Amino acid sequence: MNERDSRNQIGDLPFRVKEGFSVYEFIEQLYEAHVVERINRFLVKVTFNGKEFLAHLHDPGRLKDLIYPGNLVLIRETKGYKTKFSITAAYSNSRFVVLDSRLHNIIASKFLPEAYEKEIKVGNSRIDFKYDNTYLEVKGCTLVENEIAYFPDAPTERGRRHLKELRELMKKGFNSILLILVMRDDAKCFLPNEKTDPKFSIEFWNSINEGLNVNIKTFKLVGNKIIYVRDIPLCKTNLT
Protein backbone atom coordinates (compact mmCIF):
# COMPACT_ATOMS: atom_id res chain seq x y z
CA MET A 1 0.00 0.00 0.00
CA ASN A 2 1.07 3.59 -0.53
CA GLU A 3 2.09 5.95 2.24
CA ARG A 4 -0.87 6.66 4.46
CA ASP A 5 -1.85 10.21 5.44
CA SER A 6 -3.46 9.88 8.84
CA ARG A 7 -5.38 13.14 8.60
CA ASN A 8 -8.22 11.30 6.91
CA GLN A 9 -8.39 8.74 9.71
CA ILE A 10 -8.82 10.99 12.74
CA GLY A 11 -12.33 11.29 14.10
CA ASP A 12 -13.53 14.36 15.98
CA LEU A 13 -15.41 14.04 19.26
CA PRO A 14 -18.51 16.15 19.94
CA PHE A 15 -17.30 17.98 23.05
CA ARG A 16 -14.03 19.77 22.43
CA VAL A 17 -12.05 20.05 25.66
CA LYS A 18 -9.56 22.86 25.29
CA GLU A 19 -5.86 22.10 25.29
CA GLY A 20 -4.41 22.73 28.73
CA PHE A 21 -7.71 21.84 30.42
CA SER A 22 -7.65 19.64 33.53
CA VAL A 23 -9.56 16.40 32.98
CA TYR A 24 -8.90 14.83 36.37
CA GLU A 25 -7.68 15.96 39.79
CA PHE A 26 -6.37 13.64 42.49
CA ILE A 27 -7.76 14.51 45.90
CA GLU A 28 -5.22 12.24 47.59
CA GLN A 29 -1.67 13.35 48.31
CA LEU A 30 0.85 11.95 45.82
CA TYR A 31 4.08 10.63 47.34
CA GLU A 32 7.38 9.79 45.68
CA ALA A 33 8.55 6.19 46.07
CA HIS A 34 10.94 3.82 44.31
CA VAL A 35 10.27 0.43 42.77
CA VAL A 36 11.87 -2.57 44.46
CA GLU A 37 10.30 -5.24 42.27
CA ARG A 38 7.11 -6.11 40.44
CA ILE A 39 5.57 -9.06 42.23
CA ASN A 40 2.88 -9.77 39.62
CA ARG A 41 0.66 -7.92 37.16
CA PHE A 42 -1.10 -5.92 39.85
CA LEU A 43 1.33 -5.83 42.76
CA VAL A 44 4.59 -3.87 43.13
CA LYS A 45 6.95 -3.65 46.08
CA VAL A 46 8.12 -0.05 46.66
CA THR A 47 10.22 1.86 49.17
CA PHE A 48 8.70 4.96 50.78
CA ASN A 49 10.12 6.91 53.71
CA GLY A 50 12.74 4.23 54.21
CA LYS A 51 10.23 1.39 54.49
CA GLU A 52 8.99 -1.22 52.04
CA PHE A 53 5.32 -1.40 51.10
CA LEU A 54 3.20 -3.32 48.63
CA ALA A 55 1.39 -1.08 46.16
CA HIS A 56 -1.50 -1.93 43.86
CA LEU A 57 -0.83 -1.39 40.14
CA HIS A 58 -4.03 -0.98 38.16
CA ASP A 59 -2.49 -1.54 34.73
CA PRO A 60 -2.05 -5.03 33.23
CA GLY A 61 0.57 -3.95 30.68
CA ARG A 62 4.17 -5.14 30.73
CA LEU A 63 5.41 -1.62 31.55
CA LYS A 64 9.05 -2.72 31.33
CA ASP A 65 10.12 0.86 30.61
CA LEU A 66 8.24 2.18 33.65
CA ILE A 67 8.08 -0.41 36.43
CA TYR A 68 11.60 -1.67 37.09
CA PRO A 69 13.86 -1.74 40.17
CA GLY A 70 14.96 1.71 41.24
CA ASN A 71 12.59 3.73 39.09
CA LEU A 72 10.76 6.66 40.63
CA VAL A 73 6.98 6.34 40.98
CA LEU A 74 4.16 8.34 42.51
CA ILE A 75 1.88 6.53 44.95
CA ARG A 76 -1.29 7.50 46.79
CA GLU A 77 -3.19 6.01 49.68
CA THR A 78 -6.22 3.99 48.61
CA LYS A 79 -9.08 2.30 50.38
CA GLY A 80 -10.81 -0.95 49.52
CA TYR A 81 -7.65 -2.80 48.48
CA LYS A 82 -5.41 -5.20 50.37
CA THR A 83 -2.55 -2.75 49.87
CA LYS A 84 -2.31 0.65 51.52
CA PHE A 85 -1.06 2.40 48.37
CA SER A 86 -1.75 2.47 44.64
CA ILE A 87 0.78 3.42 42.00
CA THR A 88 -0.39 6.54 40.20
CA ALA A 89 2.46 7.30 37.80
CA ALA A 90 6.02 6.30 36.89
CA TYR A 91 8.93 8.44 35.74
CA SER A 92 10.17 8.26 32.15
CA ASN A 93 11.90 10.72 29.82
CA SER A 94 11.77 13.62 32.31
CA ARG A 95 8.05 13.27 33.04
CA PHE A 96 5.58 11.21 35.03
CA VAL A 97 3.42 8.78 33.04
CA VAL A 98 -0.02 8.11 34.53
CA LEU A 99 -0.59 4.36 34.96
CA ASP A 100 -3.98 3.95 36.63
CA SER A 101 -6.34 2.49 34.01
CA ARG A 102 -9.34 3.09 36.29
CA LEU A 103 -9.13 6.72 35.17
CA HIS A 104 -9.40 6.12 31.43
CA ASN A 105 -13.18 6.12 31.10
CA ILE A 106 -13.51 9.02 33.53
CA ILE A 107 -11.17 11.06 31.34
CA ALA A 108 -12.82 9.89 28.12
CA SER A 109 -16.23 11.02 29.35
CA LYS A 110 -14.96 14.62 29.44
CA PHE A 111 -14.85 14.56 25.65
CA LEU A 112 -18.41 13.25 25.16
CA PRO A 113 -21.83 14.91 25.17
CA GLU A 114 -23.75 14.77 28.44
CA ALA A 115 -26.14 12.08 27.19
CA TYR A 116 -24.26 8.81 26.77
CA GLU A 117 -24.53 5.16 27.75
CA LYS A 118 -21.73 3.16 29.39
CA GLU A 119 -20.61 -0.47 29.08
CA ILE A 120 -22.92 -1.48 26.23
CA LYS A 121 -23.00 -5.21 25.50
CA VAL A 122 -22.15 -5.91 21.87
CA GLY A 123 -21.75 -9.53 20.81
CA ASN A 124 -19.32 -11.14 23.24
CA SER A 125 -17.86 -7.80 24.33
CA ARG A 126 -18.76 -4.60 26.09
CA ILE A 127 -18.05 -1.32 24.34
CA ASP A 128 -17.20 1.57 26.67
CA PHE A 129 -19.58 4.27 25.42
CA LYS A 130 -22.49 4.95 23.08
CA TYR A 131 -23.93 8.34 22.17
CA ASP A 132 -26.28 9.21 19.32
CA ASN A 133 -25.39 6.78 16.51
CA THR A 134 -21.81 6.27 17.70
CA TYR A 135 -20.03 3.54 19.64
CA LEU A 136 -16.71 4.44 21.24
CA GLU A 137 -14.06 2.20 22.76
CA VAL A 138 -11.26 3.59 24.96
CA LYS A 139 -7.68 2.34 25.16
CA GLY A 140 -4.93 3.71 27.39
CA CYS A 141 -1.39 3.99 26.07
CA THR A 142 1.81 4.45 28.11
CA LEU A 143 4.58 3.25 25.78
CA VAL A 144 6.48 5.88 23.76
CA GLU A 145 9.67 5.23 21.82
CA ASN A 146 11.38 7.83 19.62
CA GLU A 147 8.34 10.13 19.93
CA ILE A 148 5.99 7.39 18.67
CA ALA A 149 3.21 6.14 20.96
CA TYR A 150 2.54 2.41 20.71
CA PHE A 151 -0.39 0.26 21.82
CA PRO A 152 -0.52 -2.40 23.11
CA ASP A 153 2.61 -3.08 25.19
CA ALA A 154 1.41 -6.65 25.75
CA PRO A 155 -0.66 -8.96 23.48
CA THR A 156 -4.36 -8.17 23.85
CA GLU A 157 -6.97 -10.62 22.67
CA ARG A 158 -9.59 -8.34 24.23
CA GLY A 159 -8.36 -5.40 22.15
CA ARG A 160 -8.54 -7.43 18.95
CA ARG A 161 -12.08 -8.51 19.82
CA HIS A 162 -13.14 -4.91 20.40
CA LEU A 163 -11.88 -3.89 16.96
CA LYS A 164 -13.86 -6.70 15.34
CA GLU A 165 -16.99 -5.64 17.22
CA LEU A 166 -16.52 -2.02 16.12
CA ARG A 167 -16.26 -3.17 12.50
CA GLU A 168 -19.45 -5.21 12.83
CA LEU A 169 -21.23 -2.15 14.22
CA MET A 170 -20.10 -0.10 11.22
CA LYS A 171 -21.58 -2.72 8.91
CA LYS A 172 -24.90 -2.20 10.71
CA GLY A 173 -24.81 1.53 10.02
CA PHE A 174 -23.32 2.82 13.27
CA ASN A 175 -20.33 5.11 13.61
CA SER A 176 -17.37 3.63 15.48
CA ILE A 177 -14.53 5.44 17.20
CA LEU A 178 -11.41 4.11 18.88
CA LEU A 179 -10.23 6.69 21.42
CA ILE A 180 -6.61 6.26 22.48
CA LEU A 181 -5.47 8.10 25.59
CA VAL A 182 -1.69 8.54 25.61
CA MET A 183 -0.95 9.22 29.26
CA ARG A 184 2.19 11.24 28.56
CA ASP A 185 3.03 14.19 26.32
CA ASP A 186 6.24 13.18 24.52
CA ALA A 187 4.61 11.46 21.52
CA LYS A 188 4.16 13.12 18.14
CA CYS A 189 2.18 10.32 16.47
CA PHE A 190 0.76 6.84 17.09
CA LEU A 191 1.16 3.35 15.67
CA PRO A 192 -0.21 -0.05 16.67
CA ASN A 193 2.55 -2.12 18.25
CA GLU A 194 3.17 -4.63 15.49
CA LYS A 195 6.23 -6.09 17.19
CA THR A 196 4.36 -6.92 20.40
CA ASP A 197 0.98 -7.90 18.95
CA PRO A 198 1.01 -8.36 15.16
CA LYS A 199 -2.56 -9.68 15.20
CA PHE A 200 -3.82 -6.47 16.83
CA SER A 201 -1.90 -4.43 14.25
CA ILE A 202 -3.59 -6.30 11.40
CA GLU A 203 -7.02 -5.80 12.97
CA PHE A 204 -6.24 -2.12 13.53
CA TRP A 205 -5.32 -1.39 9.90
CA ASN A 206 -8.21 -3.51 8.60
CA SER A 207 -10.56 -1.47 10.78
CA ILE A 208 -9.08 1.79 9.50
CA ASN A 209 -9.57 0.64 5.92
CA GLU A 210 -13.21 -0.16 6.68
CA GLY A 211 -13.90 3.29 8.09
CA LEU A 212 -13.04 3.20 11.79
CA ASN A 213 -12.27 6.65 13.17
CA VAL A 214 -9.30 6.86 15.53
CA ASN A 215 -8.85 9.76 17.92
CA ILE A 216 -5.56 10.00 19.83
CA LYS A 217 -5.13 12.39 22.74
CA THR A 218 -2.06 13.11 24.86
CA PHE A 219 -1.97 14.12 28.51
CA LYS A 220 0.50 15.16 31.19
CA LEU A 221 0.54 15.13 34.97
CA VAL A 222 1.02 18.58 36.51
CA GLY A 223 0.99 18.52 40.29
CA ASN A 224 -2.13 16.56 41.18
CA LYS A 225 -3.93 17.26 37.89
CA ILE A 226 -4.06 15.37 34.60
CA ILE A 227 -3.96 17.93 31.79
CA TYR A 228 -5.16 17.40 28.21
CA VAL A 229 -2.27 18.46 25.96
CA ARG A 230 -3.22 17.91 22.32
CA ASP A 231 -4.41 15.44 19.69
CA ILE A 232 -1.79 13.63 17.66
CA PRO A 233 -2.13 11.83 14.30
CA LEU A 234 -1.39 8.33 13.17
CA CYS A 235 2.20 8.12 11.99
CA LYS A 236 2.78 8.02 8.28
CA THR A 237 3.96 4.57 7.32
CA ASN A 238 4.36 2.23 4.37
CA LEU A 239 2.17 -0.81 4.88
CA THR A 240 2.82 -4.03 3.01
UniProtKB/Swiss-Prot annotation:
Transmembrane segments: none
Classification via Pfam families: SfsA (PF03749), SfsA_N (PF17746)
GO molecular function: DNA binding
CDD domains in the record: SfsA-like
Entry similarity comment: Belongs to the SfsA family.
Protein name stated in the entry: Sugar fermentation stimulation protein homolog
Organism: Saccharolobus islandicus (strain L.S.2.15 / Lassen #1)
Protein's gene: sfsA
